Amino acid sequence: MDAHTKTPTGPSRREVMKAMSLGVAMGTLASGSLVGAAPAAAQSSTGTNAGMGPLATRTLPRSGDTVPAIGLGTFLTFDRLPGAQRDDLREVIRTYWDGGARVIDTSPLYGTAEYCVGAFASSLGITDQVILSNKVWSTGEFAGDESHAIRSLEQSMGRLWRNQIDIMHCHSLTNVDNVVNILRAWKKEGQIRYVGVTHHENLYHDALASWIERDVVDFVQVNYSIFNRHAEERVLPAAAERGVGVLVNMPLEKARLHKVVEGRSLPDFAREFGAETWSQFFLKWVIANPAITCALPSTSNPDHARENIAALTGPLPDAAMRDRMVRHMETIPGFNDIAKMPWYPDKTYEGTIRRAQVNLRARS
């Protein structure tokens, strides 16, 4: 189905999230069917995963909306060259959706990721129910001009086939003083629902925290994992104090966590919080922090998607167990050197980003 095929009408994303917080069945509301075009498997109960029990959810402090604590990231993994096979990406989105995930994070910076998300959300009939997290970083031709930002917003809406973006971030704090003001105007005008700021490097955590402390953003997206716990120093406490939602990028350290545990069995104590795979082990550690709203692991592999989404079910580790998990990881060779490893070890994503980077390196 074309990415610009309008999905059938249904309840708004706000209604879906409110229904989740009330425990209302996702397949039906008092008035009847929710979304006729949604796959049957996607119409499981909100707050449950196809009969596997309650999902780990978080309530957004500034709205009362509730979201599942695992979503989908798309950097590199959803970037494909035009014409390349991408059925696996559709299956990843379907798997996440059927498993209860509702947040998908993307960006114009991510090559063809927006096209893929828009096309497959449309073909699955979930366009109007997905909670979209997106980004902008441009402003305009001169100080105070927002023409480039508006063009970026309109382009994203066209690719994703939406007339409103749920969470719009200033990407990597680029032009942040101007962009946040633009986002606040868009929120007031109804073009977006929430204002956010993002970064993926520890060096910028103080800057992220300062924006949280100004009380002008609703969300922050930050790197955080069992390996990289730097956000606990200032970003997460500030977000918890100010009622700001926290999206987590790099919760699996771009596959580097899996690399260091390759061939290793889970510790026996992982059974105490229902972890059956390393993905569950790492993701449950992240979302067990009460400051975290939603972790955004990325993958292009449907089997890995199933492992990731399984972290939504079962008990979460308490503070003492989380400390024990860290101590265990610190005994594994290579864990303390993860930052020195390349992203996605042993794997190359052949998309538009890589093609452009290779071409630029050849010319420079």
PLM feature spans:
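N-terminal secretory signal peptides
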Residues: 1-12
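N-terminal twin-arginine translocation
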Residues: 10-15, 26-47
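Structured C-terminal cap/extension of enzyme domains
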Residues: 26-31, 60, 234-364
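N-terminal amphipathic alpha-helix/helix-capping segment at the start of soluble metabolic enzymes
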Residues: 43-71
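Conserved, mostly hydrophobic/aromatic
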Residues: 60, 72, 104, 117, ...
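N-terminal small/glycine-rich loop or linker at the start of catalytic domains
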Residues: 63-80, 133-136
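Glycine-rich, proline-tolerant flexible connector loops at the mouths of alpha/beta enzymes
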Residues: 105-121
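Glycine/proline-rich, positively charged
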Residues: 139-230, 234, 240-247
